[in-house]
């Protein structure tokens, strides 16, 4: 494991008691580590864990960032499980009524949000530290990005308006691949041959990026969406709380993204036709008023 003691968690988060029993949080740490391994690769995670235990690291920034990400997510889950005491006689809440008070729901939500923000910031630092690491560049997920027309997190941010997040970009690689395949089929040819035309390339990037976000929103539950996308799907609940967007709001937003994608697909085709000297297709919206041809077809 990349974290092996309660004292490490304390140093990484600043909020965990170093004298807590490490075994109580060990299984949570392992599950979070496994989730991150699914993205960066299990071999890469094993190497980072070995470097952490050995004290000598080829990429110390990556080790530290990975430890912080695991620590913040694990402690958030640990705190959620321990808000209520689980005993033989049932679930109880133990509070010193003179000196303690139960937090409000909005306070718990704010604390969860703070942990999530630190978790995703640590993941972003991890991905930046791994971008130039040849060991990470050998992972299957990283190799898939070589065929993409949206090359990195900065490009994704510029095209869609989401916060620049290397972790979000890596999470979206499978959706970007599927979206690019759809765009290539609709366009009629591979997108690798359009890099010389700036306008056409931009239209293709817009279509791929918007389609990828729509795919991720449809295929993922709100709880599993990366924080960068969750901030898009949230609506202000007023007061000290923020409520998640309703299903109707989410569906409306996904429909809007799909319409935007089709707009940029049509723009790609128009630019291709202009370059080839082909006139744009025109569609008759209303029939011509012909005095000699007055009839209605049912």
Stretch-by-stretch model annotation:
Residues 1-68, 77-209, 215-298:
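Conserved short "hinge" loops at termini or chain/domain junctions
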């Amino acid at each position: 494991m990349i974290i092996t003691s309660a004292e490490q968690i304390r140093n990484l988060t600043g909020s965990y008691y170093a004298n807590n029993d490490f075994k109580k949080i060990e299984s949570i740490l392992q599950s979070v580590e496994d989730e991150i391994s699914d993205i960066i690769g299990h071999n890469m995670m094993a190497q980072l864990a070995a470097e952490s235990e050995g004290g000598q690291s080829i990429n110390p920034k990556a080790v530290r960032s990975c430890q912080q990400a695991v620590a913040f997510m694990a402690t958030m889950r640990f705190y959620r499980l321990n808000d209520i005491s689980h005993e033989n006689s049932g679930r109880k809440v133990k509070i010193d009524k003179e000196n303690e008070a139960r937090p409000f729901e909005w306070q718990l939500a704010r604390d969860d949000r703070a942990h999530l923000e630190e978790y995703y910031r640590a993941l972003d630092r991890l991905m930046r530290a791994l971008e130039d690491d040849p060991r990470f560049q050998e992972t299957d997920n990283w190799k898939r990005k070589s065929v993409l027309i949206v090359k990195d997190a900065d490009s994704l941010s510029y095209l869609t308006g989401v916060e620049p997040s290397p972790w979000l970009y890596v999470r979206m690689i499978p959706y970007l691949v599927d979206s690019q395949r759809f765009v290539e089929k609709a366009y009629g040819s591979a997108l690798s041959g359009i890099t010389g035309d700036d306008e056409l390339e931009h239209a293709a990037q817009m279509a791929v990026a918007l389609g990828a976000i729509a795919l991720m929103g449809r295929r993922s539950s709100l709880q599993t969406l990366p924080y960068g996308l969750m901030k898009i799907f949230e609506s202000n609940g007023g007061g000290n709380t923020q409520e998640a967007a309703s299903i109707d709001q989410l569906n409306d937003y996904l429909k809007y993204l799909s319409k935007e994608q089709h707009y940029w697909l049509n723009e790609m085709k128009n630019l291709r036709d202009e370059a080839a000297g082909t006139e744009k297709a025109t569609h008759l919206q209303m029939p011509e008023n012909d005095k000699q041809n007055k009839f209605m077809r049912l």
